[in-house]
Design a protein with these regions (language model features):
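Feature marking well-ordered beta-strand scaffolds used for ligand recognition
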Residues: 27-1024
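Residue-level signal for mature regions of secreted extracellular proteins and peptides
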Residues: 19-20, 669
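Bacterial N-terminal signal peptides that target proteins for export
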Residues: 2-18
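C-terminal motif of bacterial Sec signal peptides marking the signal peptidase cleavage site
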Residues: 22-25
């Protein structure tokens, strides 16, 4: 649901994440010949932009929401009763070893360790718990999963990790890393262990970390000549004795799932049974159970006996399906699984299978009890006393298969007789059940309910059940919370459902969206209980998608990726937020300014739907590894922020909500009082001189009727954004131009009448930073055309529109030959209060830049048809007397990315694919080329190309001085830096692993690049 956002700043950003961001719709196959080009030509025809047709209005769709990528998916591990404290150290032969849970947090004395999905490992001083202070941070590349802390050393498990193995080969999977935090300001790496696949679950026994990982058969590169690999599951042991992380052993098995249950001496592993490695997902619904001996305190793994059972134990559900498998008594395994592989209907049958592992080398099935009508993913929980005093299973079917009564049955099974488990009691629960949490003779059931069958009224629900008599379970009470749509991370892991029986409190984090209040509804729910009743609950509203609520002394700490909040729960019915510390801001731009850096953040997805922030920090604190309190900040009205810099003045453009009259169908968003709302843009001047941050003047653009759910500045990640260009352009330092392309027509006596004021180019004059002024003009009123691609050349603003020469046949739009003529519109801003269109000139494509010596020598990118092949070129033409005379054409084969012009040189990346013929007529694996096109002699351009057929994928991200930065890999997991020179092709210099998955902006000061990476913050990259 999250949209990765790429803001345009002073450096053009490539449309990342699509195979063809510049030229055409992916997979298009032009079949029409283009008009020949020759020197001196001044009339041009081109192919229309991708997706345009007769009557098409152009422009990217308007999106509601903001920039960030993603909620935290971290669901680590930890104690289910209170904040876990750091263990004293590894086990020994004389001390019985205990199984410990990992988690995304750890409390050790006056230190809080928190594994933040965006900012990595964060260390806080909580000696003054009401005012926690960040005292150290270790950024992490990849997706932090969970950790354990021993004697100040954190062992962190990271998934989605790209890099190279010790032998230099490409590696994608998971790692376990040791981080010595004894000096939080100088965290050190104490070793790494490479773990195949994606780690699904972990446990600690003594001083050994055990992991289970699933590998779907990753392939590297383009896979030419490669075979398809079957999925595998691996268990590994990693020693952290003495604070040093080393891999001890690893065992790999065919299959998927990887559900494992850990005791002090054994791992019981469940994987999907594969009968045909060539079709691993088409086999029977069977599961392989294996007994793995881990009795060696050093971490040696020994596989003992195993067998195959006739059901599929699913890895879906909370904690990687952990609750579908039990081995608590170290002798009998209990497994609940479906007899069809995907359990896709309410008619599928489950099996409750009991396996006798009294002899670990020769297990045997003791019983298999069929259970009908459980749906796709049943909620199960085994509650077995290792000493044998009781053995139960709590079971509820998937809520999607329970009919329309709003009730879900709770069934209790007695497992005390391995050969004859039986159903002993039932009762009804409300809604759908996600997770069961046993609490002695009581049981918590976590789920959600629906109101009137609408998903936007889905509340989190906690029900409390007396199971002291399993034959007659009785519901003791329930509480609902999270108005609107709500969810809890406890649906994914029991570690988020914190119970402190001594306090009679259960703490459940939740997050959601309330459409009535048009706001996020996040925080902690405090549920009060006694052995006989659920007596009440209270809500502490905090920021961010809350992952945990943990007890620390007399306070609760609310942990989200965005914020750490301190909650006073002395009155559990009315908990009070004492303080809140921001942990991760969605940084959209960072402008270095000598000794300081100005960071703009806009956090709509992070739960601030009305405000952005400009912060000025010491340049040495750009990465924010500590919080030393030396930064200054100022709030800015609106969200979806972008900034245009003019010295120490920042022109911040945001989307703001404005009350409007309600139309017959409403305007979409409504305030709590029923007032209709619409969006528009606001420009706020921020003065960051002398290390400060002060608001100057502001101005708001007119509201558009189609702006209810949308904003501007969202482009940059669609393949067709190359021709739209930016919707906001800075001209001459102190002016901004805005493209409004949401045309509307009013009824007229002779047909629709174009309403100019609703579709215009707006000019904001910022020459007086305390009193900005607005003016506008209409670029075109043609009902069938398009305009856009605003571009500033010095103090001159240009826009582009096109005219159809041959339009698609509406009855066969894909089989029609059609062409357009592009026209360059020069916008006269001599009088900014009265802008007007000067001359309109036919040109060969869309404007990408101009000569630094002669502003009438213009550079264009064009797309045209040449039989079955796509053709792209960079054309140079001389603007003279109402015409643009062609000087040269340089053809570029393949898909072309963004074109960046600097000092009479055009830079772009071109992707070649295997369906494109090379000069020798043979097919090769896809590869990219980085072009440096020297246009200083417009009649004789020189194209210098850097390429490596083995490199594969990459797009030009930006050009900063004598460096070009190219994305590396399918996801933006790294960048390649190329050194630029006047008389040679770009030369590869270094690769840098990047934080996060996208870049909002790239800036440079001296020998350091600053990559603005959203919630991952600012990443300084020191150039070699």
């Amino acid at each position: 649901m999250f949209i990765q956002r790429f803001l345009r700043s002073g450096l053009a950003l490539g449309a990342l994440g699509c195979a063809c961001p510049f030229v055409a719709a992916c997979g298009s196959s032009p079949t029409v010949g283009g008009t020949p080009r020759h020197t001196g030509q001044s009339v041009y025809e081109s192919a229309p932009m991708p997706g345009t047709s007769a009557g098409a209005r152009g422009g990217a769709p308007v999106n509601a929401g903001a920039a960030g990528a993603g909620s935290s998916g971290s669901s680590g591990a930890g104690s289910a009763s209170a904040a876990p404290s750091a263990p004293a150290g590894g086990g020994s032969q004389s001390t019985p070893r205990q199984v410990q849970e990992t988690d995304i947090y750890r409390v050790d004395g006056n230190r809080l360790y928190y594994l933040n999905s965006y900012r990595g490992l964060m260390v806080f001083d909580i000696s003054d718990v009401d005012h926690p202070a960040l005292i150290g941070r270790s950024p992490i590349f990849g997706d932090p999963q969970e950790m354990i802390v021993t004697n100040g050393v954190a062992v962190v498990v990271v998934g989605d990790w790209y890099g190279t193995a010790p032998d230099g080969s490409p590696f994608y999977g998971s790692i376990a890393r040791g981080l010595d935090c004894t000096d939080p300001g100088n965290i050190k790496n104490t070793g790494e262990a490479y773990l195949g696949g994606w780690v699904q679950d972990t446990r600690v026994v003594g001083s050994v970390l055990y992991t289970v990982a699933e590998n779907d058969g990753w392939q590297y590169g383009w896979g030419y000549g490669a075979t398809n690999y079957s999925p595998t599951v691996s268990i590994a042991s990693v020693s952290f004795a003495g604070g040093l992380v080393t891999k001890v052993g690893e065992k790999t098995f065919a299959g998927t799932g990887g559900v494992f249950n850990v005791t002090p001496n054994a791992i019981l592993l469940a994987t999907q049974h594969i009968t045909n490695p060539s079709a691993p997902y088409d086999g029977p619904a069977q599961t392989d159970l294996r007994y793995v001996d881990i009795s060696d305190p050093g971490g040696t793994i020994t596989v003992r006996g195993g067998l195959t059972i006739d059901s599929w134990v699913s890895g879906w559900g909370p904690d990687n399906g952990r609750w579908n498998l039990d081995f608590a008594d170290n002798a009998h395994a209990h497994a609940i699984g479906c007899t069809s592989q995907y359990c896709g209907s309410d008619g599928d049958t489950y099996l409750l299978t009991t396996v006798d592992f009294a002899n670990p080398d020769a297990p045997a099935v003791a019983s298999a009890l069929p259970i009908a009508n459980l749906g796709w993913s049943a909620a199960a929980r085994f509650d077995v006393d290792p000493s044998g005093s009781y053995a139960h299973m709590y079971l509820s079917p998937s809520g999607y298969y329970t009919g329309n009564t709003g009730q879900t049955p709770l069934s209790i099974y007695d497992l005390s007789k391995p050969s004859a488990p039986q159903l002993v009691g039932q009762t009804g629960l409300d809604g759908q059940i996600w997770l069961f949490m046993p609490q002695g003779q009581q049981l918590f059931a976590l789920g959600n309910t629906y109101s009137n069958g609408t998903y936007d009224q889905s509340l989190v629900d906690v029900q409390y059940v007396d199971v002291s008599n399993p034959t007659a379970p009785k519901r003791l009470g329930a509480t609902e919370f999270g108005s609107g749509w709500a969810w809890s991370p406890a649906a994914d892991t029991f570690k988020a459902f914190i119970i402190d029986a001594t306090k009679g409190l259960a703490v459940i984090p939740f997050s959601g969206w309330d459409s009535n209040s048009q706001g996020y509804n996040n925080g902690l729910e405090l549920v009060q209980f006694t052995p006989t009743a659920l007596v009440g609950s209270g809500t502490a509203h905090t920021k961010g998608w809350v992952q945990r609520g943990i007890f620390v002394g007399t306070r609760l700490l609310s942990l989200s990726d965005q914020a750490l909040a301190v909650v006073d729960y002395s009155n559990p019915a009315l908990p009070n937020v004492v303080s809140e510390l921001t942990l991760a801001r969605n940084v959209v731009n960072a402008q270095p300014q000598g000794a300081t850096i100005a960071e703009l953040s806009s956090d709509w997805w992070g739960n601030d739907t009305s405000t952005s922030e400009m912060r000025v920090l010491p340049i040495g604190d750009a990465a924010e590894t500590t919080d030393n309190g030396r930064g200054v900040s100022v709030p800015i009205r609106g969200v979806d922020a972008q900034v245009f810099q003019n010295g120490t003045l920042g022109y911040v453009v945001t989307d703001v909500q404005i009350p409007v009259p309600c139309g017959p169908n409403g305007y979409g968003p409504r305030a709590p009082n029923g007032q209709c709302l619409a969006y528009t843009q606001e420009i706020q001047v921020v003065d960051t001189s002398n290390g400060g941050a002060a608001l100057r003047g502001s101005v708001t653009l007119p509201i558009l009727p189609y702006s209810s759910y949308g904003g501007w500045g969202w482009e940059g990640f669609y393949y067709y954004d190359w021709y739209n260009g930016a919707d906001v352009v800075q001209v001459g330092g102190d002016a901004l131009a805005f493209r409004r392309w949401y045309p509307q027509y009013a009824p007229g006596p002779n047909g629709p009448v174009y309403e100019d004021d609703l579709d215009a180019l707006y000019v904001v004059d910022l020459s007086n930073p305390d009193a900005p002024a607005i003016a506008s003009l209409t670029v075109t009123d043609d009902l069938t055309t398009w305009w856009g691609n605003m571009k500033a050349i010095g103090n001159t603003l240009y826009a582009t529109d096109f005219r159809w020469m041959s339009q698609p046949d509406p009855n066969a739009p894909y089989g029609t030959l059609y062409t357009v003529r592009y026209y360059l519109d020069q916008i006269d801003l001599t009088d900014r209060a009265h802008p007007r269109i000067g001359q309109r000139v036919n040109v060969p494509g869309v404007l990408v830049g101009a000569s630094s010596e002669d502003a009438t020598m213009l550079y264009f990118a064009d797309y045209w048809y040449d039989g079955p092949n796509e053709r792209n070129d960079i054309s140079v033409c001389k603007l003279d007397g109402g015409a643009c005379y062609l000087q040269s054409v340089t053809e570029l084969d393949g898909y072309v990315g963004s074109v960046i012009v600097q000092n009479d040189r055009a830079y772009t990346t071109v992707q070649e694919y295997d369906w494109m013929l090379n000069n020798n007529g043979t097919y090769t694996p896809p590869y990219f080329e980085l072009h440096q096109l020297d246009l200083s002699n417009p009649q004789a351009p020189v194209d210098r190309i850097a390429t490596d057929p083995n490199k594969g994928w990459g797009w030009l991200l930006g050009v900063a001085g004598d460096r070009a930065v190219v994305t590396s890999g399918w996801g933006q997991v790294a960048v390649d830096v190329y050194r630029l020179s006047a008389n040679a092709a770009p030369s590869y210099e270094q690769s840098v692993r990047t934080l996060g998955w996208y870049a909002n902006a790239l800036t440079r000061q001296d020998n350091t690049l600053y990559l603005s990476s959203g919630y991952w913050g600012v990443q300084p990259i020191v150039l070699q």
